[in-house]
């Protein structure tokens, strides 16, 4: 068996998002656990990859250049047919299988056995193919469906939850459901507490903080809902006579929130200014992976109000960090985290604020939930994910 894998999402704008993290971790786990199998890893030439630190230790990995770096955009198909497909045809063997961890850059399901990982149907459900402009949205919509429709030619579809599987089959009811395999993702956060002085105010230990980590700036992430709920939480404290100058911070972690050219980021900043929250809301900017555990573990609660998710890696990390989790009552969170988290209507800031307040003033009440969450998080490993993935490879071989 020979496995060809597209690893470009470890190098492009998705490298530190869920898509890129999945690609990195599933490749490393597959290499580690299948030493006798030859893997060809497709990568851009002269471009840093999140795989660079670890992949050199695996002798069963052949790194294959596919040309200079190209951003993931509307020109994907031109790049695929002129740069990538010729390389695939050159290196494929009779026993080759192609594994595509993401669909946007196209994949050779029409010429060889292919397995595609579907992370979610978010873009289709929210008609959110591009946030650049309505024209860009239409262009990307056409590209999206051209790429996604090709998935019906794949031998198998992998998905990160039963929710994603169900959503995929709603759009493609003709695809055999038994050939859509659910493989929950892994949680890799290192349980090590390190100083947060470079990211947080000096008084964060005294004032405490609510953390929003692993979010995004598209509409379905509902980042504005987090800030609105936090504002209502402050109002609850004020009603109960608390000094707001000593109120817990809202910490928003992630480099994407620094891109002030994005209308979605501008909306957040404007709301913060309009409601005089500048001294209460802290943006960490980009943070190294090694700080994720400490950012989570030292918070009094983690909040994620995304209206739709495929899985929720950062939520799993929060469970591992033993922090109460407050989540929007979305299908996937009900599927995976209903017994380990507080589920709320993320579009109702008053309801969400009451949940935040209760966790803040009654921490003892949530100790059992925290322990259940930690135990649950241990179920999610990349070794398990890779094992199920490789079994699908074997079915196709």
Predicted regions and their residues:
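Carbohydrate transferase catalytic cores enriched for Leloir-type hexosyltransferases
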Residues: 1-397
